[in-house]
Amino acid sequence: SNGSNIDVAGAVNTLVETAGKLFQ
């Protein structure tokens, strides 16, 4: 992602991706 909220967006994206892998 990009933009001024990259840190927040990146953290959320990481959590979503991790959750997606765990609950596949």
From Swiss-Prot:
Native species: Pelodictyon luteolum
Cited function: Component of the photosynthetic apparatus which may bind the chlorosome to the bacteriochlorophyll a protein monolayer.
Protein's GO biological process: photosynthesis
Record keywords, A-Z: Bacteriochlorophyll, Chlorophyll, Chlorosome, Chromophore, Photosynthesis
Identification of the protein by name: Chlorosome envelope protein B
Gene expressing this chain: csmB
Subcellular location: Chlorosome, Chlorosome envelope
GO CC annotation: chlorosome envelope
Coiled coil regions, renumbered to chain: none
Superkingdom field: Bacteria
Molecular-function annotations in GO: bacteriochlorophyll binding
Family: Belongs to the CsmB/CsmF family.
